[in-house]
Every structure is written in C-alpha cells, then in structure tokens.
Amino acid sequence: MTKSMKPLKADPRSFDAFAGDYDRYAGLCDPLGEWLAGLELAGDRALDAGCGSGRHALALAGSYAEVVAADVSAPLIEVARVRRPHERIRYEVASLLDVHHAEGFDLVLSIGTLHHLPDLTAALTHLGSLVRPGGELVLVDDVSTEPAATRRQHVLFAVRELARDLRRLRVRDAWWLYRFRTGTAWLDHLMSDHYLTRAQYRARYAEVFPDADFIDLADATAMRWRRRTDDRPAHGRGPSGQRSEATDVD
C-alpha cells in the first residue's frame, strides 16, 4: 500500500482570504465546465465535494433533483449562496470527510480538491462509500511533473498565461488575472499545493478503485467509477472494503 500524502503546509481554508476574487478567477479560468457538461450526468441526488463558489453545483442542479454542495471555506460557501442560489442546492460548510447521507448519492463529484487533503486514501474511501448502488463517482484533480513548484515558477506561469489571456479575454480581465495570479494571497496558497504526476494519480486512485476509468485532461486527470447495482457496502466502507473514518452529518 502506498503511503498517504504528506500533511499540508497550510490550512485548505486559505481560500478564505480571497473567496470573492477566487470566484471571478474560476469564472475566467474554468476549462472543466464544458467537459463536465459533456458527461451528460443526471439523477436524483448529487454531491459536489469541495464545491468552492458553487459553479459546478449550479450546473448539476439542472439535471439532479437535489444537490448537496460542501466546502470547508465558509467565505466561499457564502459567495455561493449569494451568487448561485438555487432551490435544488443545499450549501454546507463542511469538509468532504464530514459529509454523509443515509441513502447515498447518484453522483459524487469532486474537482480540484483532493490534493489539499493529507490522507488521500481516506478521502477516496469515504467518497466511494457515499455512492449508492448504480451511482457514479467523478473525481478530477490537477497533476504535475513536479510535486511542488517554486514561487518563481508560478510567477513565470502567470507571465506566459498573460499572453494567451490577452488573446481570449477582454484586456481588463486578462490583466486582472495576471494580478491575481501574482498576488501574495494566491501565491501563498499555491505554495501549499503538492500534486501527483499522472502516473501517480492513476496508481493511487486505482488502489481504491481498481475497475475505474481514467481520462487525461490538459493539466488534470479525471477518474470515473460506477458502483454495481448489486454492490451495497457496509456503512462507512469504500469500494475496496476500507473503513472511512468520516463523521455522519446529514
């Protein structure tokens, strides 16, 4: 069994310091929105684990009767409630490890969140335990050839992206993105990020979901896994029989 990820240098609630700006950033730089829509997901109940400011939760509300959208950052949840209210969405301030539903979910979705957690296996196991029979788990996370880029590398990335952004966005939006990417709060947050390589992602996730499908995206890798209709795991146990230590919160 592979060892769990190293503990974080910073609390994932570092998003609290720039929640409003992050929402604008996500709106200008969301390469996964179109990809997610192309999956044509639908059902009764969905979970967006690590929902941020609610962009993907709002998209899910168009095809699910109930959406639970959870994030550990209270300011991000407040942004979501104000900017993306919907009668089908219930926003919750909670870690994905503290989310539970007695009947499970038809879809469990998590995008760009799992690299923030110190115990990846525990997180994967818990998310898998939330998928009801016949339901689907879709996980997407950033990958990199380097586990942790330097501050200088992040700034150089912002410089390179500025040229591309000036071609695809309004000038003021492109420059706003550059200032955000090179700002102290964002750079401090990025310095706590540690990514897996594509190969490591596949290996680590396949330990818990050996029959999953993997899709390589631009700077990320996605995993899709469906629970068999005859598979009813014991309460709190994931697809490989591993125990989830999550607290039950309905």
Regions from the language model: what does each represent?
Residues 1-42, 59, 138-169:
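Conserved class I S-adenosyl-L-methionine
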Residues 49, 53-98:
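Class I SAM-dependent methyltransferase SAM/SAH-binding core
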Residues 109:
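A conserved beta-strand element that flanks and buttresses the S-adenosyl-L-methionine
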Residues 192-210:
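Short alpha-helix
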